[in-house]
């Protein structure tokens, strides 16, 4: 354990967080973190269950005097988003996250930190380990594959949980208590293409759009962050219009729920157009820096010589650039009921060349079911217009707020007493597992809260250390106040 983490308070929560960072846990590859949690539960002689889908449930009896309180589910997810800077050598399947303290923040060296949702796991483990904290019966539920499919929540059985209160430990703004979330649906678009051999006289170059912040496509979509796929495509579209361009490859974005922060293309031009292309790239770098001078201070665009033997056919290239240009991205509608709350959005998440097809991924979110259908239809119409095949996932439900929640009132009273101010009670424009869990357990009383985490789903992910202490104090105080059965 690094000396920096060793000195953080509360020690037990940070101890477990450090251990978690040493265990590889990509989405859909939770074997190692699952074993770690099972070994932990068995070490403390706690009832430990692995369900059919791969979720882990650890039960701890109530402390003396709390046997007549309602059982509480502490819910977090095992997997983490695996993103790294292009110049960082790191294998998420085998390597341990390297953490560092920078001022008031804890972050990682060139990769995502995994505080989403490692800090939730660590808090639950610290409570399961502790012998002095007063609490009702606890069910610590650690779900699998939240980040790429909500698979654990989808596969959760309707008879596993005994608790009637659920505390979701997967929110990212201290002082905010969430009582609702958006539903969502992902989209896979496939566009066929053929290849053509390049003439020996052609010039080939790689164009990079990078240095963007990226971030969570739900929680940060309203910040006006740039989308690397959209920026790169603007260059390609304009170059083809001005002097003609060929495309050998396009690689932008990786995750459905992350705003793309890097995109790369290998392009082909006639020798006489080489300088025109370089000038255009330089021009667009200035344009982008001006357009995003407040939100993307590290943005850069560069061009360098590259090698390629083929390009895609010109018709497919035109279809691709036209459809990417017109594809909606960002906030589509704001809530008419909640001030400054995004109702509907979409994220142009990734563009890849794979197996002779161009694979484009988008992710739509909305707190209104009809609006979610509408934005999905917009994406479908856009790509159908160029002959692409479009397939939507089944999606996941939203979580309808319950302003009369008993645990919400407990949480409000606790926050006021601890911190001498009111918490903000909100809904979030992101998919929380509460929506799916609430479908299976309709009587479950749920809230979500957590410490302040910035830059989630990007290598800039960081956790504000003091708020983690506040999160811990808040969590254990809520447990002490749990309502009677």
Spans of features found by a protein language model:
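Fold-level recognition of mixed alpha/beta catalytic cores in primary-metabolism enzymes, strongest
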Residues: 136-228, 240
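Acidic/His- and Gly-rich active-site-bordering loop/insert found
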Residues: 3-105
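A short beta-alpha structural unit
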Residues: 18-22, 265-266, 300-311, 349, ...
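Active-site-adjacent substrate-binding region
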Residues: 220, 227-250, 401-444
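His/Asp/Glu-rich mid-to-C-terminal helical/loop segments that flank catalytic regions of hydrolases
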Residues: 158, 224-242, 271-274, 318-325, ...
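Active-site metal-coordination/substrate-binding segment of hydrolases
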Residues: 66-137, 142-164, 186, 201-204, ...
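Acidic-enriched catalytic cores of C-N bond-cleaving enzymes acting on peptides and small amides
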Residues: 180, 197-202, 221-251, 271-345, ...
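Zn-dependent metallopeptidase/amidohydrolase metal-coordination segment
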Residues: 5, 13-14, 336, 343-345, ...
